Amino acid sequence: RDGLKITQGEADYLEECTKLQRQSALWYSHRKGRITASKFGAVCHTSISSPSQSLVEGILTEENCRRRGIPALDWGLEKEPCAREEYRQAMKKTHVTFMIEQAGLFVNPLYPNLGASPDGLVSCTCCGDGLIEIKCPYSIRDSNPAAAVGRANFYLEHSEGDVKLSRTHAYYYQIQGQLAICDRP
C-alpha cells in the first residue's frame, strides 16, 4: 500500500519519535496497518485462504494495541523497567561497555508493511549489536522462572544443556522479525 511507504529519513525520525512506545500517539498510529513483529507467529500460523479475523482486526485497527486492564499485559508492563535494569546490571559484570538504548517503532523502507518495536537496542564492544525483548510472564509470577522451563506452552526449553527460546513459540517469530526489521545481527 502506498500509504505505508516511507523513506529511510522518515523511518529514522519515526523510530526516534516513538521511543516512549505505548505513551506515544505516533507509535499507535504508525503500527496501524502494519504487520508488527509481535504478530509474526500468528501470521505464520493462520490460514492464507481464511485468516483469523481477530488477527486481521489486530493489524488493521489502532485501538487493538491500546488494550489495558488485562492482568498479564499490565503485569508485564509494570515489571519491564525492573527486568531491564537487572539485565543491564548482569551484563555490565562481564561486558564493560554494555549499553541498552530505548527503541521506538522500526520500519524498514524496503518492507514498509512490517514494523518492530523491541524493548531496547543493546550493544557492547565484544558482542556487537543486538536487541532485547523483555518478557515477564504473569503465569509464573509466584514461582521461580527456572521451574517453568520445559513446561508445555512455555517459551523456554532445555536444549543441549542450556536454556533456549523455543523455535516453535510466537516469541521466537517476534524476535526473529525484530532482528530483521531493525537490521541487527
Annotate each PLM feature.
Residues 1-86, 90-94, 141-165:
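Charged, glycine-rich intrinsically disordered N-terminal tails and low-complexity linkers that flank
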Residues 82, 119, 173-177:
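Short amphipathic alpha-helical face segments that pack within enzyme cores
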Residues 87, 118-122, 126-143, 151-157, ...:
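Conserved catalytic cores of phosphodiester-cleaving nucleases, focusing on short active-site segments
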Residues 88-113, 118-121, 130:
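A short acidic/basic microdomain associated with nuclease active sites
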Residues 93, 97, 126, 181-184:
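Short amphipathic alpha-helical interaction elements and helix-loop-helix interfaces
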Residues 162-185:
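C-terminal folded domains that constitute the principal catalytic or ligand-binding module
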